[in-house]
Amino acid sequence: MSSSAAALAWRRSLRDALLRGSAWRGAPAANSAAARLASTASASEAAAGPKKVPPPPRKGRLLTGAMIGLAIAGGAYVSTADEAKFCGWLFKSTQLVNPLFALLDAEFAHRLAVTAASHGFVPREKRPDPSVLGLEIWGRKFTNPIGLAAGFDKNAEAVEGLLGMGFGFVEVGSVTPLPQEGNPKPRIFRLREHGAVINRCGFNSEGIVVVAKRLGAQHGKRKMEETSSSTSPTTSDVKQGGKAGPGILGVNLGKNKISEDATADYVQGVHTLSQYADYLVINVSSPNTPGLRKLQGRKQLKDLVKKVQAARDEMQWAEDGPPPLLVKIAPDLSKQDLEDIAAVALALRLDGLIISNTTISRPSPADTHPLAQEAGGLSGKPLFDLSTNVLREMYILTRGKIPLIGCGGVSSGEDAYKKIRSGATLVQLYTAFAYGGPALIPRIKAELAECLERDGFKSVQEAVGADFK
């Protein structure tokens, strides 16, 4: 791309983002009853006239202004710089915004970050990933193994922006069948000095209908991008990216708090959302939904997985078949629990496991923090050792036959490398991204590539489970 063409594209994207971002987004639907009475609610709102949306707090306006300023500066810079240098500059420049995010309420900062990504106020990675990071799994080629875990983009609002930042894959959700608000606020607590977060959000979700419409609209756009990119010559017969276009998209499914039939909730999620997913996740490990973790028991998990697999397989699929089905488990499990889960996974030929969700324990040094007693699941650096130990144990129990995604406490390329050597084929992060911002993504990928090359590995797949070989 020439510098003039790049500048024109940048200005157009900035203009479009400004137009789309002129109105601040309202809150999600309040409860499950609102979903069942959607038509009545819509009529009532029409009669009452448009809602008045309160302006964002002053800190939010300042932060938005700073982000727009960076975008304008980037537009000026790209006019005179080559694309690679511009990308590097833009990613590094986002670090200037991180201190401003720290001044905001945790949940408002998260909301603002999602809005920024959905409207294009984030850098877009144009540099190719190091070839050593590429791998193939489930018939899809990942350009790198670093993914964004579920919880950041709960309602699939910013998939394209997040994939564009350079993640190898993005997982949206957890998505529940009916809209629900989740637990009362405040429900997100920063333990900044420990690189950790405690949350008790409780599956706040706009529901599968809203998410399906959003993914459906994105699906068409991604399909066109895939068709366009397929005209370019390639040396590989495996598509780079997912069946719905460039980039791999996972959909994480949850259950409603008021639901008495968890299986029905997951089946409904599969029927509605699987057509847009490159892989599906059954989340049975959040500590913030009462009774959810009981589904990790051997009998309960076996019954659940069999019914969800059947629901997926009964749908009509093209040549590439149905999306892989994974289960996300907790780190707070006994040896017997892990053995039971491994047995179910092997017996039912589960496509993968995500290890792990947040912990209800308070690993050192987070246990000394004043907020440590807040209820909820802890994520971030203090979770790394616990989640990695569970990962290692599960790799042994499954004999390396089931792809594992390592999640929990990853904040550097070295951390990702340790997860891979411990048995992870892919790696996810979230909390470190919340603290470090977009600049973290290229740094982790570069560090991981250095680790692999340092130890003589020619690919990620060669290093998977290396500690046991």
From Swiss-Prot:
Binds 1 FMN per subunit. The active site is at S286. Pfam families: DHO_dh. Pathway: Pyrimidine metabolism; UMP biosynthesis via de novo pathway; orotate from (S)-dihydroorotate (quinone route): step 1/1. CDD domains: DHOD_2_like. It is found in: Mitochondrion inner membrane. It catalyses: (S)-dihydroorotate + a quinone = orotate + a quinol. Disulfide bonds: none annotated. Keywords: Flavoprotein, FMN, Membrane, Mitochondrion, Mitochondrion inner membrane, Oxidoreductase, Transit peptide, Transmembrane, Transmembrane helix. Substrate binds at K154, N199, R200, C201, G202, F203, N283, V284, S285, S286, P287, N288, N357, T358. The chain crosses the membrane at residues 62-82. Its EC number is 1.3.5.2. Its main location: mitochondrion. Its cofactor is FMN. One of its GO terms (biological process) is 'de novo' UMP biosynthetic process. Residues 227-236 have a biased composition (Low complexity). Signal peptide: none annotated. It is an enzyme of class 1 (oxidoreductase). InterPro entries: Aldolase_TIM, DHO_dehydrogenase, Dihydroorotate_DH_2, Dihydroorotate_DH_cat, Dihydroorotate_DH_CS. GO terms for cellular component: mitochondrial inner membrane. Residues 1-37 form a transit peptide. Catalyzes the conversion of dihydroorotate to orotate with quinone as electron acceptor. This is Dihydroorotate dehydrogenase (quinone), mitochondrial. The gene is PYRD.
